[in-house]
Each structure stands twice: as C-alpha cells, then as structure tokens.
Amino acid sequence: MRKIAIFNQKGGVGKTTTAVNLAAGLSRNNRKVLLIDLDPQGDISASNNINAQYNLYHFLMEGADLSECTTKLGKNLDIVHCDHKMADAEHQMAKEKGNVNFLSIKFPQNMDYSYLIIDCPPSWRMLSKNALQYASEVIIPTSTDVLGYDSLEKTIKRIVEINKSSSQKTLVSSILPTMFDTRNNICKEILLRMKQEFTPLLVTEPIRVNSKLKEAPKSKMSIFSYDKHSTGAEDYWKFIKLVLENEYMYDLSLMQSQREKALKDYYVSGKKRELMIVDNKVTFGFKFVTNVSDSIKGHFIENSKKQKKAEHA
C-alpha cells in the first residue's frame, strides 16, 4: 500500500486539486484508493457534499471505527472527511508528550487499499508533521511563480527537518509544477529553474492553467468527470500515468533499505550536504540533495568525489 502525502506549506498551489484528481484517476485505473482529508478547512469534504455523522476527528480522537467515518465517493474510491474540529484535534495532539503519531497509531497497518492519498493542511503544524511521518512518500505541488518557488525550497527544508527527528524517512517522489501559463515568461523561467535545481527526474511535466480545474469542484466532480477532454484532465492524466509507472518499481524492501541509509552526511567541495542515497537504477524519484543553505543544488551520487579526482588526474 502506497501512502502518499500531498503537501506544500503554502496555500493556493493546487494541493487539494491534486489530491482529489490523483485519487480519482488512480481509482479509474482499478486501484482501490482511500482519500484522507486532513485539512481543517475541509475543502474536499465541502466540495463533495459530505455530511456523514462521523469523520476523521471522531476516528482519531474519540475512538470511532474507521468504517463509520468512511464515505464512498465512487467505484474504488472512499474518503475519510474532516471539518473544523480537526483544528481542535491538532491542539490536543500538540499537548501529548513525546513524538506521538496519531495517524500511525490509529490507522490499521494492513488495509484493503492500494493507495492512501493524504491532503495535508498548508501549514507546518502537528497535522502536517503527523502526515509526513506516516506517509511513505510526498508529492509537492508548487505554483510556477516566484513565491511558489520560494515556498518549494522552504517545504523541502521542512521535510529535511522532520526526517532528522524521525526514524521513518519521508521520501519526495515528485515535485508537480502547477498553474503553468504557457504564455508567461516568468512561468517558463521558474519551471526551467526547478528542473535545473531539482533534476528533471523529480520535477514532472506541469499542470497548465485551465478554468475547468476551478469549475470542477463547484460541480462536485473530478476533472475527469467534469471535462475529460480539457487540458486539466490531459495534464493530470499524464501525471497519474507517471505515478502508475513508478508503481511497478515500488519495492518496499528496497525503500526500507534506502530509508536506513538516508540523510547521511555527505561532503562535496567542502560543503556539508545531506543526501538521499538511491540506487541509480531506481527511477522512483528521490534523486535530489535534501539540504540547502542558499538553494538546493542538483543530484549527487556517492562516487562524485571519485569523479572529481578523475577529472583532475
């Protein structure tokens, strides 16, 4: 079961849109998906007219059964929704002594789902920290503008921080550029910079600006149900195909060994960097340097020192 957190500490970057359409697209490919709305704003729940008696708050904080808190959205797609009470839950979580992860404790280890998609709040608080520690990977949607790029760097720094304090390392599988205007030079420059800084293996093809993506939630639909011929549907479908392609390279034992090696100190040109060590044959993401004091620079592999010596020989 792949547990994917959708996270960016900045709001308005297409995080919820990505969570909804990723879940919908995967379910259309015969994958059983549980969508977890962890954002106290409850945008997913509101846009789907969910008024179930029990929700995520009751499951995490009051001992309700998961089945009581789960609503069916469609074939192969369920949701655990939330509302403003999750803000109260966050305060209660913060009072707990020690590093208690409520999601890890409460959600069963083995569930009848292929994917868990977690829509995180756009903040660096307890709910987001719990989600990132619980998830096996994170997708970072980021708008293709200056503020979006700045937030991307800050978000990855946050992930580095939480990996330092946790035995379970969160791996970044994709950076998803959103709100890409093909006519705008700033968008083009930002996208190019993302690919240069984080490598094209990590940065996916962008989600273009498309009015249908804004209209779909008003009609309580995913973009695929609302307008399957729109550019929004086309772009998200490409992204979902990428997620599915990576699925066949998803080796849990390999990922576990990578986690054990992750965040080792690595020195390049006298500068301390933290590196996610990855088998070069695995294209399932994670190929990036995780530390940035000024900016995040490219991808280094373990033999880079040897390569430098060879160049100067």
Model-predicted segments: where are they?
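P-loop NTP-binding core
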Residues: M1-A313
